[in-house]
């Protein structure tokens, strides 16, 4: 079984390299850019030949669908540029893919906000459904707050290891 790490991006040069460094182990990396004017695409091309640009923005859901359509691997791991896969999460993902049992897997996301990780007030674990078999699940058409759809009723399983989310650097970014 093979795995594609998939990202949709726009002007993420400040985050992208650190994110992609944590995904080098993936069989395939797919980056769909929404029309960046910084060095996002140049950085992405250092890690993969599968960098496409589609600036016809119709929302996060549609953009994720477009990125999913570029995947050749058996499994999809959807990651945002401001996220990092820890070694523990990588091991958990690889074990799930090796088992090959169709399921949607949730990842425990740990958010960094204003200089520290937030582990309270419902912020952790912020479980996000991001690992799924290609063609058996996919994103809705939502403009924002897109959701992974599970039309076949696949089981939902929880993985171990954190997905680090470097969200708000300071109040200006909040």
Segments (PLM) and residue ranges:
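Residues at the starts of beta-strands that form the adenosine-phosphate
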Residues: 2, 27-28
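A conserved acidic beta->alpha catalytic loop
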Residues: 22, 33-43, 56, 80
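Conserved donor nucleotide-binding strand/loop of the catalytic core
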Residues: 41-70
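Short, structured coil segments at secondary-structure junctions
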Residues: 25, 47-48, 127, 152
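N-proximal low-complexity "stem/linker" segments adjacent to membrane-targeting elements
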Residues: 1-22
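Acidic helix N-cap motif at the loop->helix transition within catalytic regions
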Residues: 14-17, 38-47, 88-89
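Catalytic-site signature of metal-activated, phosphate-bearing donor transferases
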Residues: 61-68, 75, 86-174
């Amino acid at each position: 079984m093979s795995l594609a790490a998939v990202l949709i991006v726009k002007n993420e040069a400040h985050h992208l390299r650190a994110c992609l460094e944590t995904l080098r182990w993936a069989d395939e990396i797919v980056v769909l850019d929404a029309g960046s004017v910084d060095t996002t695409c140049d950085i992405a091309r250092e890690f993969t030949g599968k960098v496409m640009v589609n600036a016809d923005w119709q929302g996060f859901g549609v953009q994720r669908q477009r990125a999913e359509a570029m995947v050749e691997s058996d499994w999809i791991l959807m990651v945002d540029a401001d996220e990092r896969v820890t070694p523990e999460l990588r091991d958990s993902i690889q074990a799930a893919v090796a088992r090959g049992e169709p399921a949607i897997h949730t990842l425990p996301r740990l958010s960094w906000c204003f200089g520290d990780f937030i582990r309270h007030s419902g912020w952790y674990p912020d479980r996000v459904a991001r690992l799924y078999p290609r063609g058996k699940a996919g994103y809705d058409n939502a403009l924002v707050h897109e959701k992974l759809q599970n039309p076949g009723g696949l089981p939902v399983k929880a993985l171990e290891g954190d997905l680090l989310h470097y969200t708000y650097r300071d109040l200006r970014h909040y």
